[in-house]
């Protein structure tokens, strides 16, 4: 594997905030909300309608209750006609309120889905621009969670939580206004109990939040351990560590049980406390209001309406408390998404591009036709023939700027040469090939390609000129032909088949159920490792590159299969500059130059015969005195 794989990965399990209280709050609330508003603000017309419906719905639900005052007074006076029309008016107001509530809910769901779809697309687009270094330091599961869990929380926030908080705030303010309007003195009692409710929310809610955070941490630890143990079952059984695994699981399971019990205890205490305070408030208000009614300060209708508002006023308080915590957790999910989108993209200051040319002697002419000849077109319009001359001059590099893994590396590969890198794992072999295609940029020195500094070549053109077979073969969901064509998207069916024959993959492909049209799923899980590697080699062959990089290309192929592809590989490598990294020294014996690396330095160079005669590191590797990896 590439040497950078041993770098520490940051990010943790990172499964994104959910809908509970226990997740981290956003670090930059204002900035994250501002970015979200930038997305939501694209639907200004719909948002205006939502705002109007939201206000009408909340005000209507409060105003409708006021009709209880005249209704009760009509009953006391025996005016049933007036009562009838008052009930009709009340029903009409509640009907309008319900209609507005339905309308803004539907609109917010639509806005939410469109916003999240745009956000998801922008996030995916950003991932395509990030440098490989970013993926070295962020776990794939953590990045996946931003497309799934975090996107779900953003969708819920826009479609539900935000509108609910605003609606409850409007309802609370309107209800308090009606209480003061009906009897400001009696409202003082309600204010006392509202203050007590806020104290409960602050005290119990704060402890509940901490407990939920501990619960989620324990759950993450438990889930991570389960996943690790499932994947490592073979090792566990080989070393007879079943009991140790069970003991560790029991400890983590107990920790999660205790944390969950504490979290649920606090969560369960919140609503009963709020409910009891609300009922006490209602009882006290009934008694005092009854006395005021008897003394003539209150009529029966005002008392009835007031008591109804007292019942209503405590509901928004508890709901707002819960929704604000949820909303903050959901904003934290959005913040995780924007953290990826704000990451610095892969920079590309190159200007030279790869173009097709007609070659007439030493004269090159740019063309759109397929000629089989390519050239580098510089910013001044001059053309330099693409030949495959690659040179390293005093190159230093480290994945971590403070830790150098390549030291003063100098090498050259002339067009058509085969250069082999050998050495123990971590010596720097794969790192060199990563620098050729500019997956990373060097700290010092220079790398040239046909005499041009690779930093002056556009990355897409540079990588288009390289055929790469990586150690880790990845196949995409699609047909066999599509996976080979990934090396050259406009390749014809005949070019695909020719590449497969060159890699000796044609025989096994034709024995598949649908041949080249056989659909591959699950990263080619139905194919053997050798077959998957053959497809990767065919993918490189179809692009017909002048420079070929084989990173442990035959490491996953058995000896018999390796012999089958040697002839095809020789044809593929003919006339090309080839860089080879291999576990098997037999695959590098015919290289024009073999470079032996140790701890990021080239310690030996020469052909097979010369290096064997030196009886140094290469000799030890060949004779088995040292392991190649």
Where are these regions (language model features)?
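Membrane-integrated ABC transporters
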Residues: 1-61, 76-90, 104-108, 112, ...
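Short intracellular "coupling" helices and adjacent cytoplasmic loop segments at the cytosolic face
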Residues: 15-24, 113, 121-145, 149-151, ...
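Juxtamembrane helix-loop junctions of ABC transporter transmembrane domains
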Residues: 22-29, 52, 60-76, 80, ...
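Alpha-helical segments in transporter systems
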Residues: 34-37, 45-70, 86, 90, ...
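Transmembrane helices of ABC transporter permease
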Residues: 42-59, 89-96, 101, 160-214, ...
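Helix-loop-helix
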Residues: 78-79, 85, 178-192, 262-335, ...
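An intracellular "coupling" helix at the cytosolic face of ABC transporter transmembrane type-1 domains
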Residues: 132-133, 149-158, 162, 166, ...
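ABC-type nucleotide-binding domain
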Residues: 357-629
């Amino acid at each position: 594997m590439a040497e950078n794989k041993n770098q520490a990965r940051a990010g943790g399990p990172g499964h994104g905030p959910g809908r509970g209280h226990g997740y981290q709050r956003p670090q930059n609330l204002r900035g994250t909300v501002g970015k979200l508003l930038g997305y939501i603000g694209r639907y200004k017309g719909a948002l205006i309608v939502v705002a109007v419906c939201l206000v009408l719905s909340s005000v209507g639900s409060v105003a409708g209750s006021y009709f209880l005052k005249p209704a009760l007074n009509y009953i006391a006076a025996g005016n049933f006609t007036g009562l009838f029309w008052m009930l009709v008016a009340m029903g009409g107001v509640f009907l309008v309120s319900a209609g507005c509530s339905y309308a803004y809910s539907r609109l917010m769901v639509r806005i939410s889905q469109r916003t999240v779809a745009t956000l998801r697309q922008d996030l995916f687009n950003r991932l395509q621009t990030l440098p490989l270094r970013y993926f070295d330091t962020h776990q794939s599961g953590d990045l996946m969670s931003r497309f799934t869990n975090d996107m779900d929380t953003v969708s819920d926030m826009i479609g539900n939580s935000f509108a609910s908080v605003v609606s409850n705030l409007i309802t609370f303010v309107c209800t308090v206004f009606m209480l003061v309007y009906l009897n400001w003195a009696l409202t003082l009692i309600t204010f006392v109990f509202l203050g007590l409710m806020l104290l409960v929310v602050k005290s119990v809610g704060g402890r509940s939040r901490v407990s939920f955070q501990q619960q989620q941490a324990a759950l993450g630890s438990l889930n991570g351990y389960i996943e690790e143990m499932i994947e490592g079952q073979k090792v566990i059984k080989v070393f007879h560590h079943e009991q140790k695994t069970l003991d560790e699981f029991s400890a983590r399971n107990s920790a999660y049980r205790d944390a969950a019990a504490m979290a649920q205890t606090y969560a369960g205490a919140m609503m009963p406390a709020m409910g009891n305070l609300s009922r006490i408030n209602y009882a006290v208000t009934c008694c005092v209001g009854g006395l005021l009614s008897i003394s003539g300060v209150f009529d029966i209708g005002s008392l009835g309406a007031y008591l109804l508002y007292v019942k209503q006023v405590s509901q928004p308080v508890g709901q707002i408390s819960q929704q604000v915590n949820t909303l903050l957790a959901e904003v934290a999910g959005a913040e995780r998404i924007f953290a990826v989108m704000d990451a610095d993209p892969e920079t590309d200051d190159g200007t030279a591009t790869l173009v097709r040319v007609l070659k007439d002697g030493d004269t090159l002419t740019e063309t759109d036709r397929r000629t089989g000849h390519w050239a580098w077109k510089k910013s001044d319009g001059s053309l330099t023939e693409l030949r495959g001359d690659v040179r390293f001059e005093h190159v230093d590099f480290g994945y971590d700027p403070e830790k150098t893994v390549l030291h003063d590396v100098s090498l050259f590969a002339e067009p058509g040469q085969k250069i082999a890198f050998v050495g123990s794992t971590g010596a720097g072999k794969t790192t060199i090939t990563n620098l050729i295609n500019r997956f990373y940029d060097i700290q010092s020195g220079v790398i040239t390609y046909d005499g041009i500094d690779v930093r002056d070549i556009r990355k897409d053109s540079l990588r288009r000129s390289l055929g790469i077979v990586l150690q880790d073969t990845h196949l995409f969901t699609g047909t066999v032909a599509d996976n080979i064509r990934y090396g050259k998207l406009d390749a014809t069916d005949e070019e695909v088949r020719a590449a497969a024959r060159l890699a000796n993959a044609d025989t096994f492909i034709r024995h598949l159920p649908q041949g080249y049209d056989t659909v591959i799923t699950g990263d080619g899980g139905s194919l053997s490792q050798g077959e998957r590697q053959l497809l990767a080699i065919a993918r490189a062959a179809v692009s017909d590159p002048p420079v070929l990089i084989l990173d442990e290309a035959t490491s996953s192929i058995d000896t018999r299969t390796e012999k089958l592809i040697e002839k095809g590989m020789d044809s593929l490598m003919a006339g090309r500059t080839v860089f080879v990294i291999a576990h098997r020294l037999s695959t590098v014996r015919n290289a024009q130059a073999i470079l032996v690396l140790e701890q990021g330095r080239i310690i030996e160079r020469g052909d097979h015969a010369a290096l064997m005669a030196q009886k140094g590191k290469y000799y030890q590797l060949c004779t088995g005195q040292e392991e190649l990896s």
